[in-house]
């Protein structure tokens, strides 16, 4: 039942993004929401196993449409752009050793206070921010 709800939501997401709900695009959306901060290439490689004729352009176009509508966020990281389905205020915890990225809402109150203070002190209206905190994840710090 939960899978049917997810599929219905993915189909709605595609429609709202102005895209036809094809099996290939559904697979792209499913993969983006299943993985943790994937790159377009990672999504492409996984979806291509199910749909060998899918083009990389389909993946990029689908991701671009989802990004433009605010359903996912592009995160440029050095050599690759990753996609984050968590578009709410949060920090990205980036492991320096394995590269894993985790979302953390632990400091959301501080982020909101910072945005409020900036607007109050400068008349600048922040619309978004990106906070990346680098260190070692629990797995790497335990090794």
Predicted segment positions?
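Basic amphipathic alpha-helical segments that dock to polyanions
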Residues: 59-69
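Short, Lys/Arg-enriched N-terminal segment that forms or immediately precedes the first helix
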Residues: 5-17
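A short acidic, leucine-rich amphipathic alpha-helix
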Residues: 42-48, 59
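Long C-terminal interaction/binding lobes of large macromolecular proteins
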Residues: 32-33, 46
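Short capping segments at the starts of secondary-structure elements
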Residues: 21, 34-39
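Non-DNA-binding regulatory cores of transcription-related proteins
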Residues: 68-143
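Pre-recognition alpha-helix immediately N-terminal to the DNA-recognition helix
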Residues: 26-31
